[in-house]
């Protein structure tokens, strides 16, 4: 059965970019609920012994929305927490920076595309930096959808569900995304 991962930082460590209250609710309540629901859905089923990625792929193919949504949200949040750190942002490791320049034509173009993906995601969802074959791509997805089901490998994800930012930013999703990008991303992990 799946468990809530321990964060690599305290709930107050990302403040003021992401407040302690937001992190308490987001990690301790929302993420925990996805895990609890997932465990209840898969208990005693053929899914119970599968890896999280296999559950996502199988439930997506079989149109098992309850299992898929909760499994995918658990996976998405696991990545989201790892992609952030206190005093993040800053310098990108040269290997990743070179790949970004190669695939996007420059780091600022990538930044703009990533933030735009999150801003233009209608309703709840995610924006992603993923590997598609050997190329970095920015995508967005509605609700719990994950690039894994499209044969991509996500390496950076930003949650744009309102529970991610509303307490701190109200309806200012662009400001949340800019701060996430410039001040929270753990580029060493993304690399």
Where are these regions (language model features)?
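Feature for soluble, non-membrane regions of globular proteins
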Residues: 1-191
